[in-house]
Amino acid sequence: MANTFVFSSESVGEGHPDKVADLISDSILDACLAYDKTSRVACETFVKSNVVVIGGEITIPKLQDKKTGKTKPIDEAFNVEKVIRDAIRHIGYTNDDDVFHADTVFINNYLTAQSADIAQGVDAKKADGKKTAEQGAGDQGLMFGFAADETEELMPAPVIFAHRLGRELTKIRKSGKVKWLRPDAKSQVSVRYVDGVATEIVNVVISTQHTADVAHKTIESFLIKNVIKKVLPAKLLTKNTEFLINPTGKFVIGGPQGDSGLTGRKIIVDSYGGWGRHGGGAFSGKDPSKVDRSAAYMG
């Protein structure tokens, strides 16, 4: 008897509140590493309504005066507020009616230096009997990795299919050709497996934020034709495949205006979509000394 089951994985667009937080944290990280590649960064972001709160620990060696031991403020390296606003602008929260808007959000900065207790275990040191210095890890952790032969990306099919939908939706929105699309979006794909082989897509869910003046039928027909049937394998789409487009019927209020967002809340989306194990650590806002990120990438 065949072993049959259905497995579902989701993806979220860059305008989803949690992904907004992830991108802001990673943008701060990128700015730190661009200024000093030895920076130690653990940046968390919270977004809600028209507010951005960043906090965490950042140490940039180039800002430290070795003679006095004093550290210059992070704004000596780069403009933190500009980095945040540019990240939000990149996502697309720039419409006149956006409550969460790149130019008008309030920013609260609670970044401090990395704990000296942690730093002493992370900073590279030349160990006895070693020719080169070795860098320590900032913490312990559980990380898992594997490859699957279901897709070209060597990842499980459900999560890759969900990502493809999200990427195509973002591509169309940023092209400016479809004026009613807005940044917040989610997708989910359910795949039927028979004896370990993906045989059909059972259903596809896409929820996308939109302007108030577009009809649900317009959204539905456009996404099925120009997103779903464009990026998903035709051989897996059958007459029985169910398409659920904005199933609540309306998605005008979205992004941080509709829901709060926090760095690190989409760890399953960022990894294997629920296949295999996950140690619980998030990626965004962390420099390579944080094994949650670096070890997972190498896995």
Predicted regions and their residues:
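N-terminal, positively charged regions that mediate nucleic acid binding
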Residues: 1-42
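Glycine-rich, mobile lid/loop segments that gate access to catalytic sites or pores
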Residues: 8-11, 82, 87-253
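Short connector loops/turns at beta-strand edges and beta->alpha or beta->beta junctions
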Residues: 2, 48-50, 59, 148-149, ...
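A generic structural motif
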Residues: 13, 58-74, 148-153, 209-214, ...
